[in-house]
């Protein structure tokens, strides 16, 4: 299966790049649309999105390179070839989160309210971005048979794409993409519930994606490892714990319901 969507001779456009860009555009559109309802300062919003995209991509790449250092120390120029794949979403989330917390604090914007807006677009972006993994033939699971994939009603073009180096593999990218899309629907519908507390959507995202990634990662055969541990599963457990705190423990302490779309602004509520 070709990774190249368009070959212009002087430049090649990869499917991976296309889906990453689609993911970024989709998330940006949703975040801007939702932010307008909260009267977020335009300059703050543009600057935040701009830097989060940059730092998120850098963080995702750095995270991947660190855990594949044995390869990249021998092929240093490949560090910059992100179109070949190798963006670890956990790295992007961690670095992006650090920047958002810093920038919200600097501008006196409620970080949790802003994150409640961001996570809705983020999980949709993750669902789209996983298709870049498909065309790069990465993020796949254990060896299986063609008949088993047919029995699971996997589309033929995906079955063909999961034929790698003489074997068929489980399309774990597809499982995660579907679960991310379902998570998006849940977050999107939940966001307007009249009895939400600030941080609940952020917590729900952390729990949903943490559980999703933990189980999908258990099926993958190309995981980033930290000794005997699958690093993504370690981070997923931490996400679930943080999500439980924001959804339940923190909310129990807060007696006030603060629905995003009934408050009319997110400033000065850090």
Report residues per predicted region.
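A feature for loop-to-transmembrane-helix boundaries and adjacent hydrophobic helices
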Residues: 1-270
């Amino acid at each position: 299966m070709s990774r190249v969507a368009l070959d212009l001779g002087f430049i090649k456009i990869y499917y991976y790049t296309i889906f990453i860009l689609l993911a970024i555009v989709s998330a940006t559109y949703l975040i801007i649309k939702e932010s307008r309802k909260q009267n977020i300062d335009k300059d703050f919003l543009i600057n935040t999105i701009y830097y989060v995209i940059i730092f998120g991509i850098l963080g995702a790449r750095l995270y991947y390179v660190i855990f594949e250092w044995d390869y990249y120390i021998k092929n240093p120029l490949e560090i910059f070839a992100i179109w070949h794949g190798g963006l670890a979403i956990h790295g992007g989330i961690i670095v992006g989160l650090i920047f958002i917390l810093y920038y919200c604090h600097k501008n006196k914007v409620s970080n949790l309210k802003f994150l409640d807006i961001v996570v809705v677009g983020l999980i949709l972006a993750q669902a789209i971005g996983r298709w870049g993994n498909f065309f790069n033939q990465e993020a796949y699971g254990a060896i299986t048979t063609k008949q088993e994939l047919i029995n699971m009603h996997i589309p033929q073009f995906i079955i063909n794409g999961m034929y790698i180096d003489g074997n068929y593999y489980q399309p774990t990218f597809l499982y995660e993409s579907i679960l991310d899309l379902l998570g998006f629907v849940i977050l999107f519908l939940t966001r307007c519930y009249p009895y939400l507390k600030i941080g609940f959507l952020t917590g729900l995202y952390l729990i949903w994606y943490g559980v999703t990634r933990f189980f999908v990662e258990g099926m993958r055969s190309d995981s980033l490892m930290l000794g005997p541990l699958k690093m993504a599963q370690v981070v997923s457990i931490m996400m679930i714990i943080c999500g439980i705190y924001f959804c339940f423990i923190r909310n129990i302490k807060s007696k006030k319901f603060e629905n995003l779309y009934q408050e009319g602004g997110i400033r000065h509520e850090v």
